[in-house]
Amino acid sequence: MAEQAPEFMGPSDHPLDPPSREEIAAAGSLLKKRLGDEVIFASLALIEPPKRQVIEFESNAQKTPNQLGRMVCVQGYDTVKKQSFVATVDVTANVVTEIRYISEGQAPLNFPDVVRVITICKTDEGWQNAMRARGVEDVTDVQIDPWPTGGYIHPNVPEGHRAMRAISFVREDKFDNGYARPVQGLIAHVDLTDEKIVFLEDHGVVDLPPEHGRYQPEHQPSLREAPRPISITQPEGTSFKVDGHAIK
């Protein structure tokens, strides 16, 4: 017998349950009304109620539904003001209670940032010329990996701007393993606030590795024998119980 969490979990039954799909959607909708549809969300987490209230709820043997208000903390990037923010949303009352803009540091980087870096690089003339110098004319399938700047932010990036670094890998098509052909000595320093490459670090042309790194069976000289079947079962049923988000 398999124990599986339900595909969809509705409103919270316990005050410490993680935010449900409904609560996440509500928080996103409320913030988009305040900040616009182009706002970028980086993270969302439950703001736990006071411990005293949780103990009181549990000491009541959970005989009554969760009556405690549900609050979430959302970090993101306001594309209009071009600033990171931290917001508090009451998803029980359906209201944004606070939006605080970050003066030092940034909200966590996220997938929309990655997409923006790739677009900025591939449309930059300087980056395109650097790829041509390495024999790459068509950059459609070039793989670009954006990385956080860490403690090393290029001086051309203004203070307070959102930034990443990008390195490139050459692929023959979208199914190729780009990591077999790194473009060595070329790093793009990207200012995400102004959406441009502020410095292209180019240490000179290094020949691309000639061999591919594909994993598909048709590209291998031979294949190993497939492993024999393995089964892990509890024929008499599970020895644990799933109760909401608790495993007992």
What are the residue ranges of the model-derived segments?
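Basic/polar N-terminal segments that are highly enriched at the extreme N-terminus
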Residues: 1-13, 29, 33, 62, ...
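Intrinsically disordered, low-structural-confidence terminal and linker regions
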Residues: 1-23, 45, 209
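Extended, regular secondary-structure scaffolds
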Residues: 2, 102-248
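Acidic/histidine-rich, surface-exposed loop or edge segments in extracytoplasmic proteins
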Residues: 5-15, 94-105
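Interaction-mediating elements
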Residues: 22, 26, 30, 68, ...
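Short amphipathic alpha-helical segments that mediate assembly, nucleic-acid/protein binding
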Residues: 23-24, 39, 114
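Short N-terminal secondary-structure initiator segments
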Residues: 31-51, 209-218
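Exposed beta-strand-loop-beta-strand "reactive/processing" segments of non-cytosolic proteins
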Residues: 37-91, 138-191
